[in-house]
A protein has these predicted regions:
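Loop/turn positions that initiate beta-strands
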Residues: 5-6, 11
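Charge/polar-rich, low-complexity and marginally structured segments
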Residues: 52-195
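Short, solvent-exposed secondary-structure boundary/capping segments
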Residues: 25-34
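A short macromolecule-binding patch
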Residues: 37-52
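Conserved hydrophobic positions within beta-strands
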Residues: 16-18
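Absolute protein N-terminus
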Residues: 1-2
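Broad gene-expression machinery/nucleic-acid interaction feature
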Residues: 13, 33-35, 47
Length: 195
């Protein structure tokens, strides 16, 4: 059970602070059932009510500083999602987001950066679906790493790229050819990935 003041990841809502643990005085709600009242960190006035024993939506603690640093070191080895069928790919994105696992968010980001670069080289824009999942994955990953590392979220992409580039040489993605370490380069169209 979490305590008031804890920061947790709550499903696709992202990081929330537990502001209260209470029963709800509402019709149709058992009087003795405990609920977390959560405040999403990205919404000053937002509130989420969820049963303490909710098993339908993933709830977990924010990763530690050590876990965040380890994840960043492992980013070059995390493979993207290479699914040709649009509907199947979107379903996989949905599954990855729902898992609330940072490594799965990295997989989405790496995949979508490469797709974006490939599409730009062909004179095409990123699709609306890709853009939506890219924003969700980046938002969730960067906000969690920001809290874990005590670094402003706005500087997280550069921080990740710098950390990886300090320790890694360019790596090969087993499925698509050369991929520069870090996830920032591909976003800006500065990598050498061939589509």
């Amino acid at each position: 059970m979490y305590e008031v003041g804890d920061l947790i990841v709550y499903g696709r809502t992202g990081i929330c602070e537990v502001t209260e643990i209470t029963t709800l005085k509402m019709d149709g709600v058992p009087k003795d059932k405990l609920y977390y009242i959560l405040r999403p960190v990205r919404e000053k006035h937002g509130k989420v009510f969820t049963p303490v024993d909710n098993e339908k939506i993933v709830m977990r603690r924010v990763i530690s500083k050590e876990e965040a640093e380890k994840l960043i070191r492992e980013i070059p080895q995390i493979e993207g999602l290479w699914i040709g069928n649009e509907k199947q790919r979107e379903e996989k994105y949905r599954e990855c987001m729902k898992s609330c696992k940072c490594a799965e968010w990295v997989r989405i980001i790496k995949t979508l950066y490469e797709r974006k670069v490939s599409r730009l080289k062909q004179g095409k824009k990123i699709t609306a679906t890709d853009e939506r999942y890219l924003r969700m994955a980046e938002g969730n990953l960067y906000s969690e790493l920001s809290i874990a590392l005590g670094i402003p979220e706005s500087g997280m992409e550069a921080y990740i790229s710098n950390k990886i580039n300090e320790t890694e040489e360019p790596v090969l993605c087993s499925c698509r050819g050369p991929v520069l370490p870090g996830i920032a380069g591909a976003k800006n169209g500065n990598d050498s990935t061939e589509g």
